[in-house]
Amino acid sequence: MDNLGETFLSLEDGLDSSDTAGLLASWDWKSRARPLELVQESPTQSLSPAPSLESYSEVALPCGHSGASTGGSDGYGSHEAAGLVELDYSMLAFQPPYLHTAGGLKGQKGSKVKMSVQRRRKASEREKLRMRTLADALHTLRNYLPPVYSQRGQPLTKIQTLKYTIKYIGELTDLLNSSGREPRPQSV
């Protein structure tokens, strides 16, 4: 770090000694124990119409500094003249409420996962019951179909059972209608 400082000092062609000392002090980040604040220096330092980065320097202020800032005890305030914000870095040390307990976040997520598993089980049970009821109804339909519609030695599939049932009902309807009236046209 000393070599860097010496190298930096040798490059100070256009800077006066007060600028160099302030610039080097800003590099010493390890020695700062207090929060930092940006403060605009006098406008004579910058010739550009808009403020530039060179016209700001870091100044260490105690937390809750009320000198030029307006703001409450929340650690935030604004400078009226420069329009800058003071930030209380002690606010960064807080932990969110869900991290205060050792397994806080994990516990919340665990209960959510448990709810999800429980809901899936209930949905699975409802689906099983629905499929069982449907299978019973199809089995009853197969029992009412005449043996002509059944395949030899193999049970009918669900779709075959429904198609043959519709066809059988159509034939029965035709039989009833033909006893005194004309036959009903077959639909495909």
UniProtKB/Swiss-Prot annotation:
Boundaries of every bHLH domain copy: 118-172
The protein's matches in InterPro entries, at most eight in alphabetical order, are given as: bHLH_dom (IPR011598), HLH_DNA-bd_sf (IPR036638), Mesogenin/MesP (IPR040259)
CDD domains associated with the record: bHLH_TS_Msgn1
Q: Which molecular function terms from Gene Ontology are attached?
A: chromatin binding; DNA-binding transcription activator activity, RNA polymerase II-specific; protein dimerization activity; sequence-specific double-stranded DNA binding
Which Pfam families does this chain map to? Answer: HLH (PF00010)
Q: Which GO terms describe its cellular component?
A: nucleoplasm
Localization in the cell: Nucleus
Consequence of gene loss (knockout): Mutant animals die during gestation. Premature death starts around 10.5 dpc. Severe morphological abnormalities, such as enlarged tailbud, kinked neural tube posterior to forelimb buds and reduced tissue mass in the interlimb domain become obvious at 9.0 dpc and thereafter. Head and anterior body structures, including the developing heart, appeared normal. In the trunk posterior to the forelimbs, there are no identifiable somites or segment patterning, although the anterior-most somites appeared normal, with decreases in somite size and disruption of myotomal patterning in somites 8-11.
Q: Which processes are annotated in GO (biological process)?
A: cell differentiation; segment specification; somitogenesis
Listed SUPFAM superfamilies: HLH, helix-loop-helix DNA-binding domain (SSF47459)
Q: Which UniProt keywords apply?
A: Developmental protein, Differentiation, DNA-binding, Nucleus, Transcription, Transcription regulation
Name the major location: nucleus
Function text: Involved in specifying the paraxial, but not dorsal, mesoderm. May regulate the expression of T-box transcription factors required for mesoderm formation and differentiation.
The identity of this protein, by name, is Mesogenin-1
Q: What is the lineage of its organism?
A: Eukaryota, Metazoa, Chordata, Craniata, Vertebrata
